Amino acid sequence: MSKTIMKDKDMETSIPTLAVDFDQYDPKNIDVWEEYIPIGNEKERLTMAIKSANLPYLIESEKGQGKTLLTHTICKENKIALVNEPIGVGTKKSDLIGSKEINRDGTFFSLGLLPKSIEVANHFGHACLYGDEGSNQEHEVQQLWHSICDGRRSIVANGKQYKLNNGCKLAIIWTINPVTYAGVNSMTEALRSRFIGSAWNYPSNSDMESVIDWTDISIDLIKTPLLTLAQDIYALKLKGDVEYALSIRDLVQFTHHYREIQDKISKPLETALNEVVMIKFSEPAERELIRLRIEDTFDVKL
């Protein structure tokens, strides 16, 4: 059980706190949906950050590069409890700190993500709080992370201070997209100063080639032009011509989808290009630009 002490006499008198369901954070219940294949030393570095839990760790990268899978994999392999709940534009103070709930037994306080994570760490001895796309939170909400991300390692909720017990660890991992993403909030300077971390580059052709299953995929007709298309679209994004770049996840979708339909329909290549690549671009001018690139790269007609 975690230590809780009164923080401020002027704070509202606390009410009974609902118990945390620790089973859902138990390392044995962590879901790892596929194998993570490292590209460089990113698994080693993140493993060190999670195991040491000394400083919050930030990963900045394009979408679809396996950040969530890697975090799940590391926690599962090292038997570290994982707290992974959605945060983003709609995240409110009550989501992070907690809120009152009324049921047939009375009024209770339901812990939010931050004090709950401390409770989980104290229960298991070591936990990881994973915040995917954390910078999408409003700046006022990001400020609520300050005390748990610095030397205080604590948070006040329901009139009590939740703090790590001696010998217990809480790793805090955030992932964010580059600020070039449309609609992405920036991470505040005050919060970013509390993190160390790494920026993952957009994967090269050799990176993508090494982590994707190319079984039954023609090298000349599909693999080589698909890798070329991915790099071309990324270059278009850097120039501001499109807002979307193909990720490793997109290419995995393509290979899976193509294998599924190749013997079932006519023109499976054109269908896969339409249903996996073209569908990612919603703006008409962008879609037309990508269509022309696809036709030129694959020598097909869409």
Go through the PLM ranges and name each one.
Residues 1-302:
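C-terminal regulatory/interaction module of P-loop NTP-utilizing enzymes
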